[in-house]
């Protein structure tokens, strides 16, 4: 799955997701894309699930680019453990997504097939997204 090989720090602060995307808001590789409309956190499992649904719909036709990567660790303490005694262990990896960020790109397929694939993947993600195109 999508986790970094090495990080500078083992654990991160929770932080807030404010403002719009400062980069990665235009199509760079493909002709069609999926753009986020609201802020949120995507887990590596959600990104992988969306990627699988896209590749199943396309059936070896065209090319897919994943424009997000899960850099941020999320820690969690086990159940029935009292407060204190340090921060919990890493539970999952997430990527913080701002409004306007391109999540996936596709090229080499028809408009209808691209729309279908990206709408199926959109159902797997916790943020609202919209289909965008170079051609439109």
Curated annotation (Swiss-Prot):
Disulfide bonds: none annotated. Keywords: Repeat, Ribonucleoprotein, Ribosomal protein, RNA-binding, rRNA-binding, tRNA-binding. CDD domains: Ribosomal_L16_L10e. One of its GO terms (cellular component) is ribosome. Transmembrane segments: none annotated. Pfam families: Ribosomal_L16. GO terms for molecular function: rRNA binding; structural constituent of ribosome; tRNA binding. Binds 23S rRNA and is also seen to make contacts with the A and possibly P site tRNAs. PANTHER family: 50S/60S RIBOSOMAL PROTEIN L16, LARGE RIBOSOMAL SUBUNIT PROTEIN UL16M. This is Large ribosomal subunit protein uL16.
């Amino acid at each position: 799955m999508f986790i970094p090989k090495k990080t500078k720090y083992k654990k991160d602060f929770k932080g807030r997701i404010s403002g719009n995307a400062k980069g990665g808001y235009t199509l760079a590789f493909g002709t069609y894309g999926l753009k986020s409309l609201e802020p949120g956190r995507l887990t590596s499992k959600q990104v992988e699930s969306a990627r699988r649904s896209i590749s199943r719909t396309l059936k070896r036709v065209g090319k897919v680019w994943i424009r997000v990567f899960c850099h941020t660790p999320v820690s969690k303490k086990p159940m029935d453990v009292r407060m204190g005694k340090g921060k919990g262990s890493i539970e999952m990896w997430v990527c913080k997504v701002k409004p306007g960020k391109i999540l996936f790109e596709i090229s080499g397929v028809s408009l209808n097939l691209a729309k279908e694939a990206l709408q199926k993947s959109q159902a797997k993600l916790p943020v609202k997204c919209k289909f965008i195109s170079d051609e439109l």
